[in-house]
Amino acid sequence: MSAPQPKPVRVLLLGGTTEASRMARALAQAGINAVFSYAGRTDTPIPQPLPLRIGGFGGADGLAEYLRAEAITHVIDATHAFAV
């Protein structure tokens, strides 16, 4: 009997800071499957080396649905410490 295969890693990087851009570069360079997400309030998003999404999720339920629909296995919150 073979062991179950682990789910492929897929990361949602919540960004908007210099640190998030650095993390995006590190994830891309490591070949990790990831998506960079800017909040909807972003006027001029900085290009990132990862696929990009812009906008909120519509609350906790919307975020949970996005995580399921996109098969996200890990979330990195690299938003600004005072973001609301």
Give residue spans per PLM region.
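Short, polar loop motifs at secondary-structure junctions
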Residues: S37-T44
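Short, structured coil segments at secondary-structure junctions
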Residues: A30, P47-L50
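Structural motif
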Residues: L14, S37, D77-A78
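Glycine-rich, highly charged phosphate/nucleotide-binding loops
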Residues: L50-E70
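Glycine/small-residue-rich loop that forms an oxyanion/phosphate-binding "nest" at active or ligand-binding sites
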Residues: L67-V84
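A short, flexible N-terminal coil/short beta segment enriched in small residues
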Residues: S2-N33
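N-terminal positively charged helical leader segments and presequences
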Residues: L13, R41, L52, I72-T73
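Short, flexible loop segments at the rims of nucleotide/cofactor-binding pockets, characterized by
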Residues: L13, P51-G56, H80-A81
